């Protein structure tokens, strides 16, 4: 790949105005898009060809230059460069803003980065940016200090003048009043007139006094404000600010809008701020310290990177290329356009209006209003709806801004970068193909011809059936006869990939060799249905074609269905015979007493077959047959003198002989009935002991025999096969009496309602079980339904019980059990009431399934995200740690029995230490692979526990090592370097998610509800554990060893723990209805659970440490899956738990570069501490942090991965501010940028190998002139020269940098 060597990491940062102008090819000055008459882009508009490039290849706007020979010329008439039209996908423009605006991500994001940097509350910041308040940007302290005495004197003087003026005005009015009164006195006026004159004078004086006092107050206010004025002060009172500016404008500067912010940022001293914050953190407490920590993170981000904080204020806005925001003409002559064009037009219109207003010298208030509108227009372009009401288009639909283009399922990351459409693919309905081999699929001819079209056309030309590609294409389109012969030749040994959605685990995509079939449906091998979870009721599957030789080789070696027999979640076979095949093999291997030919002896199997064909020997009769090359089974008793390799006369049936013929020749003789369990054991054993080729062949034999004998068995179902047990009425009558007795006790008031319900439920459960037993006894061995269920082919006894026995108890819509059972069976038919109460459960089941699917899919997505960078990076990390796991436990009689969870805990691991028996004899060396055989040997030798390597204790810096992971469950061998074990773990846990129940069970209806003990189970419990949430009804654990006392008051109970070490008592308040696990005065150990309920994993981590927390999480997750009968290997859960515990919160930073309170990757924390210690300084201290999977995914070192997961804008904002560099170590990052993923064959150690094909191999590829003769590519299969045989990579020394 060309991009392979181009770059090793990807950095994101803040773009400054000069960056934006450098990227740009010209300024967009007009809001016009395209001319409605000519349909050509307008000059200087949003689609301008001069800026963004020509809209037709090699043609300028005015048409002066056409054709490729003018390449690179810039037309002197229209100024358009003659080049390809696709430059319109990459050339950017820009808009020069008449006033700066702030970037909404940095001001409105949570937390507000701008607010933290400038130490302003977000609402104050908003006031400044949107022109509601002035902000002081600089104060000349020295000049103010020097001039203060003079200014004070001036102020006092002015104040005195105001007072004097007031007093003199009042005195004047008093004089006038006196004269007036004297005049009135002389005229002998009435008292009323005098009063009127006095009142009028009083009013005038009051007005003067009020006005003067207001002026004096304002003067004082302005003066006090000026004296205490400092930078970043806000002033929302416009009048006060104007007066302040008019009087003392020399000493300070202030402004509003983004200009104020910009001025502040220009003068901001990062280093000094950082110092003062560190000082606050050292000496401060509480809120101040917390805020200082948060601010320091932001300040540090700018200090330690090349980022300038001025990038948060924009002087120019970039305009993205026009092809990424297209405008297309619809049929009716109207245009459909991208929302971005509307948002850009609003910005340009407002910008142009602002320029005009500034040129006209409009009043400040009008200009400010226009600036505010420009700010809002840019905000809605970047992130519409983040502040205020979103800008809407027709039909009140919010317009999609640049941020909306990135985030969510339909955003750029998830829609186009992580999920791409691919060519060379098709889809069709699937049907069963019982004649296929395990590695084959049937591909419809027409589909195959379309998929392989280019290959067929080239081959037609090579074989001279067509003169050129054009005529070859015509031949293919007209389905000429030669085409089909060529297609047959082309598809030989060219694998195709089949995929069924939903692809829940890696077995959802597998490779097959195509066989051409008639019709239009894809034929699928019946044994791979289990892996795809497919059935033939109308399912569809997609076909993909691997093109390159590398892709074909990978498909054939790694993905071929015959190589994917084991399930990655538990290492057990997934391609098991099912349904018809089981019933056929069951029919073949059962023995029937008293049938034709019983007791005869045959000299060979063929003689017995002849007798069967002649009708004198029944398939299931017990006979003796002489067998050559007989390999005895475990329980075969050899006659005296018999030696291995000799023929033997075996007592068996012809069916058993035919069944054993399907197994490998050296496989021990199986003399058991082949039901589902027995077949599973056989296939499991084959997968452990035989090469994959043999296993695949055997599976095909079993499938063929199964179908053949299923047809011959004549298994049918009729209504007469359903036999209702005769004892049913008697059983029910007996229990009716018991139920009536309980009811009467309740009516007499002897028992409470809860007890009555519980007892009735117990009674009817017992009745149901008795009827079920009677029904099973009444079914004969030859009954078809009995055979179907007993063999494991289909159905279970519970379903049969409901059809032929009794429907039993059902739940009401609340999920509580109704204490009256449905007594009818489906065979007898339900009454109306019974039918009605049965419908609740059925509907709930359907609604549940739909919810479960969505929740389970989201869980898988989070699991994949948190674990996607766990890749096996090295062979051995060299750790001495491991987990000690049990193999055997003593039962009630003191005898050793195999531990029930061995299959999913010890199996497929690597031993950490050697294992010896009681006498000291070494049974297995350290580093040995623990398989079924070794487990059996250790158990036989009486070993009870072993220490094994685990991902939890692995010390690899990145990813994990092969020894700690152990055996890859999908292949049965030690895991390869490069295996993406994190994704496998996520799939293994997520895939069975849909089988888990959704509900919070009420274990016995209302009874448990009264105790308030809802046990969260199923999927919600799994989510609670992986998200590390505190569970509902959390149970406390003892924080120290000591004695516990129970104290009760009327309101509540509390447990008081007195620690042994004499530290102060610890009190745990608990609910009165909680069930205690300790009694008053008991001794408890540290970490012991005190009450029934779920434990908070964070508490376990705090009290018992990380190892115990890991163990607790693994056990709890496994408990939920086991309760549903789902087997998942512990190592998958361990991989996820390792990711949850890989961060450390820094408590004290010491002399390191880490910040207190920072969440640091454990590897980075340890590396930094090693560096500090080696320089003789003080290392940082930290505590382990348990993070939920969502939080852990967002906290990853890779910003690309985090942004494509959730909260895209928040992640990108933070990453750009910190100037983060993505080392591209995980899988998602590389998928996003289109590089090969660094896992599997994408690792350098596998990609940098060249193997030259031999001439003989080239010649062998096609006998006729080769279709691929110009490829340096070796054919797969055929008789290849020995030097071209596959070579194990371990034989190559690939150099140390690949390790």
Swiss-Prot record:
GO CC, any one term: DNA-directed RNA polymerase complex
Keyword Repeat among record annotations: no
Cited NCBIfam families: PRK14906.1 (NF011498), rpoC_TIGR (TIGR02386)
Quaternary state and interactors: The RNAP catalytic core consists of 2 alpha, 1 beta, 1 beta' and 1 omega subunit. When a sigma factor is associated with the core the holoenzyme is formed, which can initiate transcription.
Source species of the chain: Renibacterium salmoninarum (strain ATCC 33209 / DSM 20767 / JCM 11484 / NBRC 15589 / NCIMB 2235)
SMART domains (UniProt xref): RPOLA_N
A single MF term (Gene Ontology): magnesium ion binding
Cofactor annotation remark: Binds 1 Mg(2+) ion per subunit. Binds 2 Zn(2+) ions per subunit.
SUPFAM superfamilies cross-referenced by the UniProt entry: beta and beta-prime subunits of DNA dependent RNA-polymerase
Designated name of the protein: DNA-directed RNA polymerase subunit beta'
Top EC category: transferase
The protein's required cofactors: Mg(2+); Zn(2+)
Domain of life: Bacteria
Binding-site positions, Zn(2+) 1: 60, 62, 75, 78
């Amino acid at each position: 790949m060309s991009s392979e060597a181009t770059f090793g990491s990807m950095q994101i940062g803040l773009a400054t105005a000069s960056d934006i102008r450098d990227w740009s090819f010209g300024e967009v000055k007009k809001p016009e898009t395209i001319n409605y008459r000519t349909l050509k882009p307008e000059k200087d508009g949003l689609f301008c060809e001069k800026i963004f490039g020509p809209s037709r290849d090699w043609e300028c706007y005015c048409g002066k230059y056409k054709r490729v020979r003018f390449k690179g010329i810039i037309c002197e008439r229209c100024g358009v460069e003659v080049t390809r039209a696709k430059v319109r996908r990459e050339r950017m423009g820009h808009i020069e803003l008449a006033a700066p605006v702030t970037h909404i991500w940095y001001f409105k994001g949570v937390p507000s980065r701008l607010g933290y940097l400038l130490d302003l509350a977000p609402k104050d910041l908003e006031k400044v940016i949107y022109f509601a308040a002035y902000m002081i940007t600089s104060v000349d302290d020295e000049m103010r200090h020097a001039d203060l005495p003079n200014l004070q004197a001036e102020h006092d003087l002015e104040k005195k003048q105001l007072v004097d003026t007031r007093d003199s005005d009042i005195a004047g009015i008093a004089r006038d009043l006196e004269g007036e009164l004297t005049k009135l006195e002389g005229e002998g006026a009435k008292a009323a007139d005098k009063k009127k004159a006095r009142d009028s004078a009083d009013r005038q004086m009051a007005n003067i006094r009020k006005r003067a006092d207001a002026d004096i107050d304002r003067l004082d206010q302005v003066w006090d404000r000026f004296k205490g004025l400092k930078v970043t002060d806000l002033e929302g009172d416009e009048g006060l600010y104007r007066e302040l500016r008019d009087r003392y404008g020399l000493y300070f500067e202030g402004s509003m809008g983004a200009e104020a912010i910009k001025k502040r940022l220009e003068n901001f001293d990062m280093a000094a701020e950082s110092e003062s914050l560190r000082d606050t953190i050292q000496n401060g407490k509480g809120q101040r310290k917390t805020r200082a920590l948060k601010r320091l993170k932001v300040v540090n981000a700018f200090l330690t990177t090349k980022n300038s904080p001025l990038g948060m204020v924009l002087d120019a806005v970039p305009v993205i290329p026009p092809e990424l925001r297209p405008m297309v003409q619809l049929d009716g002559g109207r245009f459909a356009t991208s929302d971005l064009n509307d948002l850009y037009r609003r910005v340009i219109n407002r910008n142009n209006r602002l320029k005009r207003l500034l040129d006209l010298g409009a009043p400040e208030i009008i200009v400010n209003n226009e600036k505010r509108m420009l700010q809002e227009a840019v905000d809605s372009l970047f992130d519409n709806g983040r502040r205020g009401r979103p800008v809407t288009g027709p039909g009140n639909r919010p317009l999609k801004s640049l941020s909306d283009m990135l985030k969510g399922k339909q955003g750029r990351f998830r829609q186009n970068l992580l999920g791409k459409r691919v060519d060379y693919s098709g889809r069709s309905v699937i049907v069963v193909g019982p004649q296929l081999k395990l590695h084959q699929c049937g591909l419809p001819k027409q589909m195959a011809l379309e998929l392989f079209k280019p290959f067929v056309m080239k081959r037609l030309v090579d074989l001279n059936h067509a003169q050129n590609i054009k005529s070859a294409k015509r031949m293919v389109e007209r389905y000429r006869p030669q085409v089909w012969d060529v297609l047959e030749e082309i598809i030989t040994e060219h694998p195709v990939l089949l995929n069924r959605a939903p692809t829940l685990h890696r077995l959802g995509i597998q490779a097959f060799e195509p066989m051409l079939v008639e019709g239009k449906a894809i034929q699928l091998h019946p044994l791979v249905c289990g892996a795809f979870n497919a059935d033939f009721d109308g399912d569809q599957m997609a076909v993909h074609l691997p093109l390159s030789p590398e892709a074909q080789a990978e498909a054939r070696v790694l993905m071929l269905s015959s190589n994917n027999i084991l399930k990655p979640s538990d290492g057990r076979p997934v391609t098991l015979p099912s349904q018809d095949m089981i019933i056929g093999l069951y029919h073949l291997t059962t023995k029937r007493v008293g049938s034709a030919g019983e007791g005869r002896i045959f000299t060979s199997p063929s003689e017995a077959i002849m007798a069967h064909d002649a009708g004198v020997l029944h398939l299931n009769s017990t006979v003796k047959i002489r067998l050559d090359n007989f390999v005895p089974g475990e329980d075969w008793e050899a006659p005296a003198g018999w030696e291995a390799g000799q023929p033997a006369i075996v007592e068996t049936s012809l069916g058993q002989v035919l069944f054993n013929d399907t197994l490998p020749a050296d496989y021990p003789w199986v003399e058991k009935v082949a039901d589902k369990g027995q077949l599973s054991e056989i296939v499991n054993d084959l997968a452990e002991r035989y090469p994959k080729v043999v296993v695949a062949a055997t599976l095909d034999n079993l499938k063929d025999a199964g179908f053949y004998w299923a047809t011959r068995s004549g298994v049918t179902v009729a209504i007469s096969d359903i036999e209702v047990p005769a004892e049913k009425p008697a059983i029910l009558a007996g229990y009716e009496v018991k139920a009536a007795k309980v009811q009467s006790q309740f009516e007499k008031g002897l028992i409470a309602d809860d007890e009555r319900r519980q007892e009735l439920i117990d009674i009817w459960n017992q009745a149901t079980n008795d009827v079920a037993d009677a029904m099973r006894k009444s079914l004969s061995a030859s009954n078809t339904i009995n055979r179907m269920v007993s063999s494991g082919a289909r159905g279970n006894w519970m379903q049969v019980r409901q059809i032929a026995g009794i429907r039993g108890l059902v739940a009401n819509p609340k999920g509580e059990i109704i204490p009256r059972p449905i007594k009818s069976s489906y065979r007898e038919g339900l009454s109306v009431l019974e039918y009605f109460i049965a419908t609740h459960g059925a509907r709930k089941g359907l609604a549940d399934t739909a919810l479960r699917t969505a929740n389970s899919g989201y869980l898988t997505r989070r699991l994949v995200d948190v674990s996607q960078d766990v890749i096996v990076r090295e062979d051995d990390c060299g750790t001495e740690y491991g987990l000690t796991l049990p193999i055997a436990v003593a039962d009630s009689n003191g005898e050793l029995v195999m531990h029930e969870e061995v299959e999913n805990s010890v199996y497929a691991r690597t031993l950490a230490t050697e294992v010896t028996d009681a006498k000291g004899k070494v049974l297995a060396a350290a580093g040995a692979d623990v398989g079924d055989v070794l487990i059996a040997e250790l158990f036989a030798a009486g070993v009870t526990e072993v220490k094994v390597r685990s991902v939890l204790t692995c010390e690899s810096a990145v990813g994990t090592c092969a020894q700690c992971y152990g055996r890859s469950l999908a292949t049965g061998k030690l895991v390869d370097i490069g295996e993406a074990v994190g994704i496998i773990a996520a799939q293994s846990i997520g895939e069975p998610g849909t089988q888990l129940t959704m509900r919070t069970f009420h274990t016995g209806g209302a009874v448990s509800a009264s105790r308030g003990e809802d046990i969260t189970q199923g999927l919600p419990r799994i989510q609670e554990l992986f998200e590390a949430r505190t569970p509902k009804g959390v149970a406390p654990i003892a924080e120290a060893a000591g004695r516990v006392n129970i104290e009760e008051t009327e309101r509540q109970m509390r447990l008081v723990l007195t620690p042994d070490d004499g530290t102060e008592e610890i009190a745990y308040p608990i609910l009165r209805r909680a069930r205690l696990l300790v009694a008053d005065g008991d001794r408890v150990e540290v970490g012991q659970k005190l009450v029934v309920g779920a434990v908070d994993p964070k508490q376990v981590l705090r009290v018992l440490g990380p190892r115990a927390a890991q163990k607790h999480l693994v056990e709890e997750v496994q408990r939920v899956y086991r309760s549903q009968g789902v087997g998942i290997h512990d190592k998958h859960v361990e991989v996820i738990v390792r990711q949850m515990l890989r961060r450390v919160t820094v408590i004290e930073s010491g002399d390191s570069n880490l910040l207190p309170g920072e969440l640091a990757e454990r590897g980075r924390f340890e590396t930094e501490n090693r560096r500090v210690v080696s320089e003789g300084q003080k290392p940082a201290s930290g505590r382990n942090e348990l993070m939920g999977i969502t939080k852990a995914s967002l906290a990853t070192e890779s910003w690309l991965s985090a942004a494509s997961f959730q909260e895209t804008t928040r992640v990108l904002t933070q990453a750009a501010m910190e100037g983060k560099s993505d080392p591209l170590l995980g899988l998602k990052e590389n998928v996003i940028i289109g590089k090969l993923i660094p896992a599997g064959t994408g690792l350098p150690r596998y990609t940098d190998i060249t193997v030259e094909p031999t001439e003989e191999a080239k010649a062998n590829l096609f006998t006729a002139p080769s279709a691929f003769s110009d490829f340096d590519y070796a054919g797969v299969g055929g008789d290849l020269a020995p030097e071209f045989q596959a070579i194990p990579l371990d034989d190559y020394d690939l150099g140390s940098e690949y390790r």
